[in-house]
Amino acid sequence: MNDLLLAEIKSEQNEQLQTFLLIEEFIFGTKATVQCELDELVGYCQAETDEVAEPIERAEVLINALFVDQLFIDEPQQNWSVISHQLSSALAHKLVSPILKAVLIAHIANACDCQTDIVFVPEKAMLRIICDDNYAIIFDPVTGESLNWHELDVRMNEVSGDPFEITLDIMKQESLVLEHITSLKAAFIREQAYDNALKCVDMLLALNPNDPFERRDRGFLLHQLDCFKVAYDDYQYFVEQCPKDPAAQLLKLQLDKISITDTILH
């Protein structure tokens, strides 16, 4: 990954959706061509909300415009496909992975004068539209369902610390990117697109150098691409860094049986 893209990801000054489109261009090797669709979405939502002066009502109209009119409503999924991580195909199929969808909705909402950010609510990223000093709507980017105060309180009870001092943290762009690329990597692996999965791992390692689990995954991908001698070093690093991990213990037994000098696995 080039230094310019890495700097874009780490910066908190850049428009998040544009950063995600740059990542998409790097991984898929094609320039994103979704500006017309984005402009249409923003234009539609602005037309629906422009005449609504009251902030809470404007937020509700916006959510309805996106999840009902534009068919953004979806069901939670354990695994998201590759196409759901690429904005053009995701919009075409009305199937957008959670983090990408959160970034997209935040972009549209802010363009509609709804002050919106992405916050971490255990265990997921959710959208928050701030209506005034005392009221905000927090909702799931996948289903569009909002949390009431009781549901929010139950979720926040999972966070350690003084309950009177716990606040919702705005997710940094780098955290959103890490979660998005990790999900995309898993989708590529499920679909056996190992070359593209390797691009994801390289990006993750650029952001978190020598993460043992990413080194393990890179070893697996290199192994699948018949580069076992290179993969061996990553496997060995994972075993050394995480000796108590059950996967590392099993992998060590396998590595001990291999003579790296004369064995190439296919």
Identify the residue ranges that each predicted region occupies.
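A structural boundary/capping signal
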Residues: 1-266
